Amino acid sequence: MTGDMNAREYSTRSHARRTPETVAHVMAAAARLGPDGRGRFLAPAALQSWPGIVHGGGLVALLDAAARALGSGDGPRRLEGRLTSSVPIETALDLEGHAERDVATVTILERAQPLTSATVDAGAVEADPAEAVPAEWTAAGREGWPMPLSDQCLACGAHNALGLQLGLRWDRDGVWAHFRPRASWRGPGDRIDPALAPVLLDEVAWWLGALVTKEGGLTNRISVTLLRPDAAVPGPITAVGRFADVTPVDRRRIFWRTRSGLLAADGTLLAVASIVFRPGAEYSTRQMSFFRARTDPENFARMFPGYAG
């Protein structure tokens, strides 16, 4: 989750034309890169987070998809996103990309100024990783409290026909979601779309950072490793992260690093993420009225005690 918002506008439904059926179709149409490394970017409203801007994890997923034109494959890979500036929806922008060996880099530009870039590195991940899953990465036996839903966010928008329509929960230990992805996020053979991991884990990371720092904010560095993108995942999945793993990046505590994972129903680790969250009162000023209006007062006081009065 990244960028700015307006609480009044956030509930406004998109008036854009109906989006295609699957997230793969939408993203392929939004980010078109030619084999010469040049292309165009035009994201529909269905890919937004806060009103008017593209979802942060969605941006990484879009640039991963665009990198296919440069020869980037569908196997295990690491996605490294640098969200320098918010990227507007329904605005024609430029794409530039290049590839060298197993690494492809794609950048979104506005009047030659970079807004966001992502690197797709297939050489950074082994084909059959054996990374251990922390015992605390589970939704089993957890109840917790619900997160507020939005209307049109790609991840948590209750009225976004394309979106995950995600209901995150939290407790004293961390943040999680346990659900079966909708048909628009699935492909043949019970495979989940590769866009799901960056979108979902970015959302988990935002809440991990916000609930540890007790402030609103944004994510600006997104690293997601797709460990088993070709695996069949027929049942529900779990996305989870722990507050204990949220740590300051710098001495001034301006940036905080989060850690989260995506697991199949049998506990198989599908993806891991290391995502940087930047909190601040300037973000809270714009975001808290939205959350307060959509959250039970007692729950809101637990989440953001400094803004509960």
Positions of PLM-derived features:
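Hydrophobic beta-sheet segments that form the core/acyl-binding groove
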Residues: D74-P114, V224-T268
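Ordered, small/hydrophobic-rich secondary-structure cores
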Residues: E21-T105, L109
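Active-site helix/loop of acyl-thioester processing domains in fatty-acid/polyketide metabolism
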Residues: I53-P76, D193-G217
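A structural microfeature
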Residues: P114-A118, L270-A273
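Mixed-charge, glycine-accented linear interaction segment located at domain edges/termini
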Residues: L263, L269-V276, E282-R286
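Non-catalytic linker/capping segments at the edges of enzyme domains
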Residues: M1-A43, V103, A118-P188, S289-G309
